[in-house]
Design a protein with these regions (language model features):
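Ferredoxin-like alpha/beta domains used as RNA- or RNAP-binding modules
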Residues: 1-102, 129-207
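Mid-length scaffold segments of soluble, non-membrane domains
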Residues: 101-104, 108-120
Length: 207
């Protein structure tokens, strides 16, 4: 899947490459926001800085505002004292992200297509819901026909990120299987993220 042009503009606006969007290089030629020139970045207000942290999560994991708020509500219900870490864990364990992190796809949008087209198995059963949250010890694998898919081959040959330590790969009956061996947390978000600013953004808002 080609990286959409607006994904590059999004990353330039943030001054940060978001791995989930796929191909690197968004900042290599023009490391400044669209509409600006030179290397001086505009100074932002405290509110804008807090908003930016929220945008990083929403854009990297390709979520609508409504979807992100639902994940926040679920995280606050499960672990109210440490809900941001719980949120990070849930986002990292979304099926589309796990497929991407395993190197089965070169980006989260590409992984989402594999999931929605029924190419992904969880514990041997087809799951076609990208927002499905994978549990610890569950196995993720590809259907046989998916191994010939160009998106899969691209991801396997040149993964965007190294395999995180909460995942492992095994060869099972001649197939590559990914396993969630531990619960991820804030430290596994694959880009600089200020949890404090993010928390402040939602402190006065009802998710």
């Amino acid at each position: 899947m080609a990286v959409k042009r607006h994904y590059f503009k999004t990353q330039r606006r943030l001054g940060l490459e978001l791995p989930g969007l796929g191909k690197s290089g968004a900042l290599s030629r023009r490391p400044y926001p669209p509409g600006e020139s030179g290397n001086k970045r505009k100074k932002y207000s405290d509110y804008a800085l807090r908003l930016e942290e929220k945008q990083k999560l929403r854009l990297n994991y390709i979520l609508t505002e409504r979807q992100l708020r639902r994940f926040i509500r679920d995280s606050k219900t499960g672990q109210p004292a440490n809900w941001v870490n719980s949120l990070a864990s849930r986002l990292e364990r979304r099926l589309d992200n796990v497929v991407f992190r395993l190197g089965f796809a070169p980006s989260i949008p590409a992984a989402r297509q594999l999931v929605s087209h029924g190419h992904i198995l969880v514990d041997g059963k087809k799951v076609d819901i990208s927002s499905f949250v994978v549990k610890k010890d569950q196995e993720i694998s590809l259907k046989d026909k998916a191994l010939k898919n160009q998106t899969v081959l691209q991801g396997l040959q040149k993964p965007r990120l190294d395999l995180p330590d909460y995942l492992r790969k095994e060869d099972k009956d001649g197939k590559v299987v990914g396993i969630v061996q531990a619960l991820p947390g804030l430290e596994h978000i694959p880009f600089p993220f200020d949890a404090g600013l993010f928390t402040e953004y939602y402190a006065a808002r009802k998710a």
